[in-house]
Structures are given as structure tokens and as C-alpha cells.
Amino acid sequence: MAEIKSEETSEKKSLNFIEQIVENDLKEGKNGGKVQTRFPPEPNGYLHIGHAKAICLDFGIAAAHGGVCNLRFDDTNPTKEDVEYVEAIKEDIQWLGYKWGNEYYASDYFQQLWDFAIRLIKEGKAYIDEQTSEQIAAQKGTPTQPGVESPYRNRPIEETLDLFQKMNSGEIEEGAMVLRAKIDMASPNMHFRDPIIYRVVKHPHHRTGTTWKAYPIYDFAHGQSDFFEGVTHSLCTLEFVPHRPLYDLFVDWVKEGKDLDDNRPHQYEFNKLNLSYTLMSKRNLLTLVKEGLVNGWDDPRMPTICGFRRRGYSPESIHKFIDKIGYTTYDALNEFALLESAVREDLNDRATRVSAVLNPVKLIITNYPEGQVEEMEAVNNPEHPEEGNHVIEFSRELWMERDDFMEDAPKKYFRMTPGQEVRLKNAYIVKCTGCKKNDAGEITEVYCEYDPDTKSGLPGANRKVKGTIHWVSCAHCLEAEVRLYDRLWKVENPRDELAAIREAKNCDALTAMKEMINPDSLNVLPCCYIEKYAAGMQPLSYLQFQRIGYFNVDKDSTPEKMVFNRTVGLKDVWGKINK
């Protein structure tokens, strides 16, 4: 699969700080002049848009310098991992336009990591601790106070080796003991205070089955896996800055006694993606799915890549957004409106224009011949005239938007109202003559007369009319379901709000999330009408419903009834609300 190019390919864009580091390394001839990166997801959930930012950097850096980016699954926690997530992650990366060099798993290195741990024990650099997790945490100290050494810190090497073997044989229960690296309990870096590097997990692994019972901790597996693979630039988000000295120390230990100034991985950190009105914790996203607050991982309200895909975002729109926000060394909250702006910009270029009526009322042209049908020309995409036109049928009875009619309209109302002319897009100029109501006072029909000399394309069509509305022919359209999606959360910063609610009310995350959910995040319109040109369009087809917004064909569509998802409106409604 070809990689998707940035929107700035026509001119040299300024380099972000990581690109500058890589270029300087190449100029200095480091790492033998090669660049190798990796994207290391844990297969315990679906990728979200925050991962997309990391993916674009990992793969983009490698591609820009003739290097390779490998995919490595960090599968060191078998209780939360599943093959389902592995396959979904691969699909998302490919959809974003990237192809990895090699596919690796941390479990590929379980034996090497085990052997390394054995070596550390023999060198007196690791020991088995039988304290509880609470006791170990209490002995860690604080950033301003040194920790307290474990009473097991100096246990005999042979005893530690024997217990470590028992951890993996199944003789030791989960939580009964751990293997800790012996570093410095007085270090100002809390991660150096004898970190846990192995623990017991009695759960089958999705690749290795029950071969292993003792599993390495992420900090122990990460740097060594990078080293085993030949990674040159290990790119992480900012929360891993305090982990970097430990990363370097373990790499020093694994190749102790050899020259490590070159051909070794170096960790660099960049800011993660924080997005307003968005919660990206996998734990919380999993809760939403399990509790039925959303309709699966690919619910179009979810911040997952598959959710955005189903909603109608294109890979290019996500690339545009990430190009705009860039990479820095400080965290910031990015506006969701900026993401939507990138989506609008992209879909304006690629979406096919069609007419659809979401809140229909019948419009009858009283002086139009009964039984007559005309074929009008509609432009597929004004941004790309080469894509041509399509036919939209016109007849005496049409569906129009209920919001496009007012019986008693104010002076500056330019749509359908008695005595006023309006243009029917791609068709004629008509004058409204009245309406019909039911016993409840609801408008059921609108009446108008057309001017046959004002057909689109004829000289008479040039007559100035301020209002233009869209329509579909009652006899030549499809009934469809339209799902109007909006932001899932009603608060700008749901991560902080979640923590605040939980603290204030002493409640669990689910209770707090229910309080924050936007009740208008999904509005299903079961009876809408769309021109029949849309019939047979495949799921993920990009459309603009003229005058309404951008929409996408949903996978729930059937030959009998199509389903469309609103991707984004034509304008930023939330931005106006918040001003």
C-alpha cells in the first residue's frame, strides 16, 4: 500500500524537532547512517486518534529518510490482550496509508528477556521481593525523601534464582512475589528505586499459551526489544521522559562491556494528542463499549480510528489535522473544531454532491403538468469538473426541507414563504402560493407555481432570486435512515471533568461518564429522502448532502434501505455556541 503524502509535498516544510534530531544524526554518521523506528501498540484495545499521531511520526520519519518502521506488539500483559485487537490494529495502520517493514511481538523476545534477567540475578543486580504491592509502594519514598530498602534486597543469589524459576513454573501465586532490579533506593529518579521487572501472571497468552507464567514489565521489555531489533530512534510521548534514564540503563546492562556510543536505540519524547470533547483512555473506552453506552468500538462517536473511519473521515483528513498541530515538547489541548476543519477541507475536495431531505414536507408545483418528468443535470463535484454530472429527476411533487418554509416569515427570510420566489437548485424558479395544514395545525403540503422560462441553463434562469433550496422528486428518490452524530461528551475537557466528578461524588468512572455524556450525540432520522443516484453506493463513500453537511454510507445499509452517517456539518456549530 502506498503511503499517503502530506498536503505540503509541493514545498519544503519546516522540520519538527525530532526530524531535526534525525537529520543531525545522519549528518554525523550515527547508527551507520540508517534510520529505524517502530510503532509498539499494546493489543488491549482499538487504536484511537492519539495513536494516529504517533503512527504518522514513526512511519513518516522512517519513510522520509529511506529507513524502515516495524510494527511491534507490546504483548506483555496476557490478561488484557486479544488477537481481535492485533488484527484491528493492523487494519487501522494500513487504512492510514502505511506499510510496516517487519511484524514483531515483545513475546518474540521472552526467552532473551528471561536470560537477561537470569544474568542480572547472577550479577547481583536483581532480587526476588515477597512483600505486598502496598508495602513496596510505601517503601518507594517520595521525590524529596529516599526510599527504604526491601528486607529481601540482599537475599542469596541462588535462592533468588530458585524462586525466579518457581515464578515461571506455576508454583507461585500471582502477587506473591516479584523480581526487582537492584539500582538505587535513594535516587532522585523514582523509576530507579528498584523497579519491578517481572511479575506472575497465570493467564494464557494469545501467542505463547501457558509456556510462561512470569512476564516482564513494560519498562524492562521496551528498551531491550528496541535493541534486539536495531531501532535507532525510539519515539515516545512525554510521560516517558522520566523513564528514559531507566531505558538507557537497561540497554547499557544488556550490552555491558561493549561500545554503546553507536548502533543503539535512543529514546525521544513528543507531546501526545489531547483533544477537546474527547476521552481517549482505553480503559474508559472499553467501559463505554462493555456497558452499552456506545455501539461498539467503531461507533462513529468514538475517538477510535475505526470509529472515525465509519463516521466518514478519510485517512487524508487525519493526516491534514496532524500536520496542522505538529509535534512539540509541551502538552496542549487541541480544539476538536480544528480536527473538523481539516475534515471539511478534505471532504470539500473529495465528496460527491447529492440532494437529500432530512425533515421532509411535500412541495406541489400546481401548474406543472401531471405525469411529466424532466431530467436535470447536477454537478458531481464542483472542485473537480472532470468528474462530470449526474441526472436528477424533476416532477410535479417534490420533497423539500420543512425548515425551508415559513408561513409568516420575517423580512430577511429568503426561502419558501407565500408570495416570494425561490430557486429550486438545478431546476426552476418557483413562487410560493400557500400551504395546507392538518387538524393539529401542522403543515402537510406547500404549494407553488413554476416559471417554465427559468429552467437551469436557460437565459431566464439568470433572473436574480435571493434564495435557493434543494429538493428531491417524490417518485424518484430513496427512503433512507440518517444518523446525526455529534460530540459524545458535553464538557470540553472530559478527562479532567471525569476526575473531578469522581472525587466530588466518590463514584466510579461509569457513573461519572454517564453524567458527562452528551444526550444529543446521536439523533436517528428514520424517514429521510435522497436522490436515487446514491443507490448502490458502497459503505465509506464520501458525500455532501447539499446545504446540510458531509455524510458517509454506513455498513448497516441494505438494498432496501440505505443508512447514512453525518460526518460533519458544513459549519462549526459548536464554535458558535461556545462564543
What are these regions (language model features)?
Residues 71, 75-77, 83, 105, ...:
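Active-site cores that bind ATP or allylic diphosphates and position pyrophosphate for catalysis
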Residues 13-23, 27-90, 206-237:
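N-terminal catalytic cores of NTP/NDP-binding nucleotidyl/phosphoryl-transfer enzymes
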Residues 240, 244, 248-250, 316-319, ...:
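Core subunits and conserved enzymes of cellular information-processing
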Residues 1-13, 579:
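Basic/polar N-terminal segments that are highly enriched at the extreme N-terminus
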Residues 85-111, 116-119, 124-127:
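A glycine-rich helix N-cap at a beta->alpha junction
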Residues 29, 58, 89, 120, ...:
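Residue-level signal for inorganic ion chemistry
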Residues 40-43, 72-80, 102-111, 134, ...:
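Conserved short loop/turn motifs at secondary-structure junctions
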Residues 262-342:
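Long, charged, mostly alpha-helical binding arms that flank functional sites
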